[in-house]
Amino acid sequence: MNKPLRIKHPMIKIINNSLNDLPAPTNISMWWNLGSLLGMCLMIQIVTGLFLTMHYTPNIEMAFSSVVHICRDVNNGWLIRTLHANGASMFFICMYLHVGRGIYYGSYMYMNTWMTGTIILFLVMATAFMGYVLPWGQMSFWGATVITNLLSAIPYIGTDIVQWVWGGFAVDNATLNRFYTFHFVLPFIVMAMVMIHLFFLHQTGSNNPIGLNSNIDKIPFHPYFTYKDMITFIILMMILIMLCLIDPYMLGDPDNFVPANPLVTPIHIQPEWYFLFAYAILRSIPNKLGGVIALVMSISILMIMPFYNKTKFRGNQFYPMNQIMFWIMVIVICLLTWIGKRPVEEPYIMTGQILTIIYFSYFLFNVHIAKMWDTLIKT
């Protein structure tokens, strides 16, 4: 009997087993589409970024002008640029939803997959931050100055590290050059990490909405889930294209339409909207080093979740109190994003501090509330 090429060919067989004939649980919901959406977002970012890099000049005298040139003179350059900028926002929306899904349904129990996913999140955040610096507008320059300056909080060696990162005594041409280099290289490292992430995921198989072993009830990924993924592909592309064609600069900062000027500080320095929750956590700690630690912890705290003692059920589906806590945390993250945009004055300072405490409390108390619920069920 002749086997099809996808099963015979050694190279195509690998792709086939991880995409076409992959056994997937029958009951996975739309929340499981986010992984493929993230893959699509990454491809959009790499392709649009590649075309942008053909026309961009990483020099402080010409960077701003080269971005203007892309938007005005390059064929469809305005579209490529807005797709790249707004594509990053879509990427982060999908990523935060993906992480939220993992927390809610207990996917963090797959330790290797969860850890590589958290590393990918860090890498993408670093890539996005460096990309924000490249247009060399006011917010690009001052954002880079403020965020890189946080490294000076490291005891003893902080100042030396900052000057090493800057390549001088201030954010200058050397900084822009190295940020451009890393912004170009990091997405390919992210791609490699995604391959490892998928490798670990396919070792265990996907989780599902009820958190039970689904080995007895699986179907091939194609055609069932490929068509299902296509629906969300189309929805995401429609949202992205509508955003780019109707209000392309809605999510940007007006200060970035002004070329970088080291002598004029913007009234309110802030990062892109998808970093505002972490920025609010940073600002809510009065001490500089404490703020930096809280900033890093706001993401790295995800890494403690696989070490939770196992509860009777996987995920929050069967824990009403944990569901309430989860949705409170979602609201808290939205409020922190809002606080990050506000000036540093009362009542925003106190509000930010209270929200920061609630945010970290979720990760500390979540497992204990679930254990308490287990005890109630037992009795």
UniProtKB/Swiss-Prot annotation:
Named from the GO MF annotations, one term is: metal ion binding
Record-level GO BP terms: mitochondrial electron transport, ubiquinol to cytochrome c
- Binding positions (heme b b566): 98, 197
Name the residues that span the membrane.
34-54, 78-99, 114-134, 179-199, 227-247, 289-309, 321-341, 348-368
Q: What else is known?
A: Heme 1 (or BL or b562) is low-potential and absorbs at about 562 nm, and heme 2 (or BH or b566) is high-potential and absorbs at about 566 nm.
Q: Describe the task this protein carries out.
A: Component of the ubiquinol-cytochrome c reductase complex (complex III or cytochrome b-c1 complex) that is part of the mitochondrial respiratory chain. The b-c1 complex mediates electron transfer from ubiquinol to cytochrome c. Contributes to the generation of a proton gradient across the mitochondrial membrane that is then used for ATP synthesis.
Q: Spell out the subunit comment.
A: The main subunits of complex b-c1 are: cytochrome b, cytochrome c1 and the Rieske protein.
Listed name of the protein: Cytochrome b
